[in-house]
Design a protein with these regions (language model features):
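Hydrophobic alpha-helical transmembrane segments of multi-pass integral membrane proteins
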Residues: 110-141, 145, 379-392, 408-444
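Structural signature of hydrophobic alpha-helical transmembrane segments
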Residues: 1-8, 73-77, 130-135, 192-208, ...
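Hydrophobic mid-bilayer segments of alpha-helices in multi-pass membrane transport proteins
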Residues: 5-15, 24-47, 78-84, 208, ...
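Short helix-coil transition sites and intra-membrane helix breaks within transmembrane domains
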Residues: 75-77, 88-95, 125-135, 163-171, ...
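Alpha-helical transmembrane segments of multi-pass membrane proteins
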Residues: 112-124, 150-163, 188-207, 381-384, ...
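Re-entrant/interfacial helical elements at transmembrane boundaries that shape
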Residues: 134-144, 158, 171-182, 403, ...
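Transmembrane helical segments that form the transport core of multi-pass membrane transport proteins
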Residues: 257, 276-424
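Juxtamembrane and boundary regions of transmembrane helices in multi-pass small-molecule transporters
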Residues: 24, 166-279, 474-526
Length: 526
C-alpha cells in the first residue's frame, strides 16, 4: 500500500502534463500540494517515515522539507539556469551569435554534424565542467540561434545531455555514489575508478545509439551515413571515457571524452562531409574568433580554475563566504558557497565576455533583468519540483517506491536496477541526488542477492556490488532526459514556457529505450 501511495505524485505529474496538457509551472505546483497532503495524512499511518524522524511532528518535518527544497532550487540551480541563459542573451545583444553561427556553418553545411557537435560534443563538455542544466540551456539556445525549431532544439539537447551527466560537474555524481556505499564514508580511488568504468560499460551501446538518434532526428534520409558517423563518434567517445574512468576516476571522463568527440566530429566534417555549395567560405581572424567566443572561453577558464581539477583554488573558494542555514527537525544544514558555485562563475564569465564584446555594464544589467523576468514561470516550476522531491524523500515515499520494486522483481532485480536511479533523477532532477537516495539501497540488494564477490563483467573483472551500485547512475542518466526540471530548463532556453508537456511527450520514448537498454546491460553483465 505504501508503494502505491508513494507513486501518486509521479503519476499525477505525468497525467497533468501529458493528459491534461497543463503548463509545467501549474503541474509542478499542484503536484507539490498533493504531495504535501500525502506526507501529512498518509506517510505516518502507513509507516513510511524513516525511524530517525518517527518521533518528529509530521507538519514540521514536511514544512522544513519544503524549505530545504526551495533553498536547493534557488541556490544554485535557478542561479545557474539564469546565468546560462544570460550568457546566451549577451551573445544575442552583442550580435556575436551571428559570428558563432557563421563559424559553425563554415565547419560544414551538414546540419546533422552541426547538431551533434553542439549537443553531444559541446553539451557534454559543459556538463563535465559545470552541470546543473548548462548543457541543456546553452546548446538549445545556440541551436535556436542557428535557425532550428524550438521543439527540435529542446529534444536533441535533452537526448544529448544524458551519458555525460554521470560524470557531470567534474565527476560529482559518481564520486558521491561511491562515498555513499563506502564503509568509511569516503571511497578509495580504486573503488571510484572501478565504479566509473562499470558505469561506462553499462552505457556503452548508448554512446552509439544516441548520436544515431540525434543525427536521424536532424536528417531522416541518410540512415547509412548517420550510422557511420554515430559509430565513429560513439566508439571514440566510449573508448576515451572508459580509459579516463578506469585509470583516472570520475573527474575527467565527460570532459576529455567530449573533447575527443568534438575532435572526431570536426575531423569527419573536414575529411568526409559533403562540400559546401557556396564557392567562397568565410574565414575569421583570431581576434574575431576570440571576441565571438569570449563568453564561453571565460566560462571554460573560470570553471576549470575554480573546479576540482585545480585543488588549491577549489579548496579556497569552498572554505570562504559559505552561508549555512540550520534546518530544524531535518537534522541537516544547508550550505551555499557564494564564491564557489557555478552560477557565480557563469555570471563573471558572461559579464566579462560581454564587456569584451563591446557592451556597457548598464546594457549587461538590462539583459540580466530582462532574462530574470522571462524566467518567472521557470522559478515556480523548479522550486515546486525540488520541494516535491524533498518532501517525498523525508516522508519515505522514494524509499517505499524502491522497496516495492525490489519485492516484486526478486532475482530479476538487476534488470530494473537502472529504473531505480531513473526514478530518483526524474523526481529530484539530479544524478547526484539520485545516487544519494539509492546508493545504499543498491548495495543492500546486492548483498541480498549474494553479489558480494568478484566477477567478470563484459571482460572487466571487479566487485559484483560495485556493478549493481553503478547501475544506479546508469539509470539516473536516462531519467535526466525526462526529468521535469530538465524539461523546465529546455522550455526556458527555447522560449517555450507552457509547453513542458509537449517536450516531455516527445522525449519519453527515447528515455524508455535508454533505461531498458541500461537494464539489459546490467542484467546480462551479472
Amino acid at each position: 500500500m505504501a508503494s502505491i501511495v508513494s507513486i501518486i505524485p509521479i503519476v499525477l505529474l505525468f497525467i497533468l502534463m501529458l493528459g491534461f496538457k497543463m503548463a509545467g509551472h501549474k503541474s509542478a505546483l499542484l503536484t507539490l500540494v498533493v504531495t504535501v497532503l500525502l506526507a501529512l495524512f498518509a506517510a505516518s499511518p502507513l509507516g513510511m517515515i524513516a525511524p530517525e524522524h518517527a518521533e518528529d511532528s509530521v507538519i514540521a518535518l514536511t514544512g522544513w522539507a519544503v524549505v530545504e527544497g526551495i533553498l536547493k532550487a534557488v541556490f544554485p540551480i535557478l542561479i545557474i539556469i539564469l546565468m546560462a541563459i544570460y550568457s546566451y542573451n549577451i551573445l544575442v545583444e552583442s550580435k556575436q551569435i551571428e559570428v558563432i553561427k557563421r563559424q559553425f556553418t563554415s565547419i560544414t553545411d551538414d546540419k546533422g554534424l552541426l547538431v551533434l557537435l553542439l549537443v553531444w560534443g559541446f553539451g557534454g563538455l559543459l556538463e563535465g565542467m559545470a552541470g546543473f542544466g548548462t548543457a541543456v540551456a546553452i546548446p538549445a539556445a545556440i541551436l535556436i540561434g542557428l535557425g532550428f525549431k524550438p521543439m527540435f532544439s529542446a529534444l536533441v539537447s535533452l537526448i544529448g545531455n544524458t551519458v555525460a551527466t554521470g560524470f557531470g560537474a567534474v565527476g560529482v555524481p559518481v564520486t558521491t555514489l561511491c562515498n555513499e556505499v563506502a564503509e568509511s564514508g569516503s571511497a578509495s580511488a580504486a573503488q571510484i575508478c572501478e565504479t566509473s568504468a562499470f558505469a561506462i560499460i553499462q552505457l556503452a551501446p548508448l554512446f552509439i545509439i544516441l548520436p544515431f538518434i540525434i543525427l536521424t532526428l536532424t536528417d531522416k534520409h541518410n540512415l547509412i551515413k548517420n550510422l557511420i558517423i554515430a559509430l565513429w563518434v560513439g566508439v571514440i567517445s566510449v573508448v576515451v571515457q572508459f580509459v579516463c574512468g578506469y585509470y583516472l576516476g570520475s573527474e575527467t571522463p565527460a570532459i576529455i571524452g567530449s573533447l575527443a568527440a568534438i575532435i572526431a566530429i570536426i575531423a569527419y566534417a573536414k575529411v568526409f562531409a559533403r562540400k559546401s555549395k557556396v564557392q567562397y567560405k568565410e574565414t575569421f581572424t583570431l581576434a574575431e574568433s576570440l571576441k565571438a567566443w569570449s563568453v564561453y572561453l571565460f566560462i571554460l577558464i573560470f570553471i576549470l580554475v575554480s573546479g576540482a581539477l585545480c585543488p588549491p583554488v577549489n579548496a579556497f573558494l569552498k572554505s570562504h563566504l559559505v552561508s549555512a542555514v540550520h534546518l530544524p527537525v531535518l537534522d541537516s544544514t544547508f550550505k551555499f558557497g557564494w564564491i564557489s558555485n557555478a552560477g557565480l562563475m557563469l555570471f563573471l564569465s558572461a559579464t566579462i565576455g560581454g564587456l569584451v564584446q563591446g557592451l556597457s555594464l548598464k546594457r549587461l544589467m538590462v539583459v540580466l533583468a530582462r532574462t530574470t523576468v522571462n524566467l518567472r514561470k521557470t522559478v515556480v516550476t523548479i522550486c515546486s519540483l525540488i520541494a516535491l522531491a524533498s518532501v517525498m524523500n523525508y516522508s519515505g515515499m522514494i524509499t517505499s517506491i524502491a522497496s516495492g520494486l525490489v519485492a516484486v522483481t526478486g532475482d530479476f532485480y538487476p534488470l530494473v536496477a537502472p529504473m531505480i536511479g531513473a526514478i530518483g533523477t526524474f523526481v529530484t532532477g539530479s544524478d547526484t541526488s539520485s545516487n544519494i537516495l539509492f546508493a545504499k539501497l543498491q548495495a543492500h540488494v546486492a548483498n541480498q542477492l549474494g553479489m558480494t564477490g568478484q566477477s567478470t563483467f563484459f571482460g572487466m573483472e571487479g566487485g559484483q556490488e560495485n556493478w549493481l551500485v553503478a547501475a544506479n547512475t546508469t539509470g539516473a542518466t536516462g531519467g535526466k532526459m525526462i526529468s521535469p526540471q530538465s524539461i523546465a530548463i529546455a522550455t526556458a532556453a527555447c522560449d517555450m514556457e507552457g509547453k513542458d508537456g509537449e517536450i516531455l511527450r516527445s522525449a519519453i520514448p527515447y528515455a524508455l529505450l535508454y533505461i531498458v537498454l541500461g537494464g539489459l546491460m546490467v542484467y546480462f553483465g551479472c
